[in-house]
UniProtKB/Swiss-Prot annotation:
Annotated family: Belongs to the lipid A palmitoyltransferase family.
Pfam families assigned to the protein according to its UniProt record, in alphabetical order: PagP
Keyword Nucleotide-binding: no
Signal peptide bounds: 1-14
GO biological process, one term: lipid A biosynthetic process
Membrane topology: Lipid-anchor
Source organism of the structure: Erwinia sp. (strain Ejp617)
SUBUNIT field: Homodimer.
Catalytic residues, chain numbering: 57, 100, 101
UniProt function note: Transfers a fatty acid residue from the sn-1 position of a phospholipid to the N-linked hydroxyfatty acid chain on the proximal unit of lipid A or its precursors.
Positions of the record's site feature: Role in lipopolysaccharide recognition: 66
Name the record gives this protein: Lipid A acyltransferase PagP
Organism lineage string: Bacteria, Pseudomonadati, Pseudomonadota, Gammaproteobacteria, Enterobacterales
Amino acid sequence: MKLKPVLYLLMLLGCLGLKSAHAATLAHGISASWHSFSQKWNEPQTFDPYIPSIIWHNRWTYDADKIDKYNERPWGAGGGVSHFDKKGNWNGIYLMAFKDSFNKWELISGYGWEKTWRPLSDPDFHLGLGYTAGVTMRDNWSYIPIPVLLPLASIGYEYVSFQMTYIPGTYNNGNVYFAWLRWQL
């Protein structure tokens, strides 16, 4: 019967050891991410103008009368700084202001990361797939900062990239494709 408390104690100590190892890994990940973020900000390789280009509401998830009322030409502008890491992956910090679906101003600011591939013999052609994390502020949410975590993809040639994301949602809400041009200066 004395074996049971010893086993419980060993299991508890084992779990604490795993938690400690996990915490150390998490702390290292946060530290590495912060270093990467600060490097982009303090040592950018390029300064990038952004031109919002397309807002497209998924026709399978919206009623036609809603789509007819929405703006799908998001004129606006933005800017950012970016950096390619040792592996050739793109990292950037950005801010954009554009006219949203209701033709009201929307702001979005954040950090983006893309794994970059160069699938052709021409090294100037590139594809990217990654994520963006940041905050957005819209008129219909009283410009309260709302956190966002979205997929990010791109196709580009030399210093110009067409970047895009998809905002998931429910019927008649969300389910929006948003794209913009980014030049690396």
